[in-house]
């Protein structure tokens, strides 16, 4: 079913993996469960005792939550397009998010150029296309757009220098 959905352009991805359903709210039930409602994520507490103690008080057993920023939503749409469809329309991202793609993602494009030289993808004026040789590495390609991974790499690089 997932293969058919990918071929038909109906494949989606969420934090749990691939799906044929787009943007579904996911409710978190159980210890350490993660839920998604709209542009927010919440994770439940991590121990069974704490989970039941909080429920017994009539509260939700949420440990932490985050609300996605406009940048998070932009990057999520790029990562999803690359991982689900193996291509990204630069123009559609610019229109949907009111950005100049090449300016906003100059650093990411520079990183992708090395992958392009390796035959994993192709970048032109309107598209980023994952080539057959890059499909098995699409996760690494998409990770270029993950701001949180980039900041972790920069922090690690800086701390190694010191």
For the regions a protein language model found, what residue spans apply to each?
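Short amphipathic alpha-helical segments
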Residues: 73, 77, 88, 107-110, ...
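Short amphipathic alpha-helical interaction segments
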Residues: 100-117
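Minor-groove-contacting beta-hairpin "wing" of winged helix-turn-helix DNA-binding domains
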Residues: 127-131
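Short secondary-structure transition/capping segments
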Residues: 1-5, 114, 136
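A short, conserved structural fragment
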Residues: 116-126
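C-terminal scaffold of the Radical SAM
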Residues: 1-102, 156-162
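Short, amphipathic alpha-helical interaction segments positioned at domain boundaries
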Residues: 133-162
């Amino acid at each position: 079913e997932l293969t058919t959905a990918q071929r038909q352009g109906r494949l989606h991805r969420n934090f749990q993996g691939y799906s044929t359903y787009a943007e579904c709210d996911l409710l978190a039930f159980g210890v350490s469960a993660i839920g998604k409602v709209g542009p927010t994520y919440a994770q439940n507490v991590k121990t069974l005792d704490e989970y039941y103690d909080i429920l017994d008080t009539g509260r939700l057993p949420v440990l932490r939550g985050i609300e996605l920023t406009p940048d998070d939503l932009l990057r999520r749409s790029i990562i999803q397009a690359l991982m689900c469809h193996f291509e990204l329309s630069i123009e559609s991202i610019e229109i949907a998010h009111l950005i100049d793609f090449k300016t906003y993602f100059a650093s990411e494009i520079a990183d992708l150029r090395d992958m392009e030289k390796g035959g994993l993808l192709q970048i032109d004026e309107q598209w980023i296309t994952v080539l057959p040789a890059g499909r098995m590495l699409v996760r690494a390609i998409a990770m270029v757009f993950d701001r949180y991974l980039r900041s972790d790499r920069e922090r690690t690089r800086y701390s190694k220098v010191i």
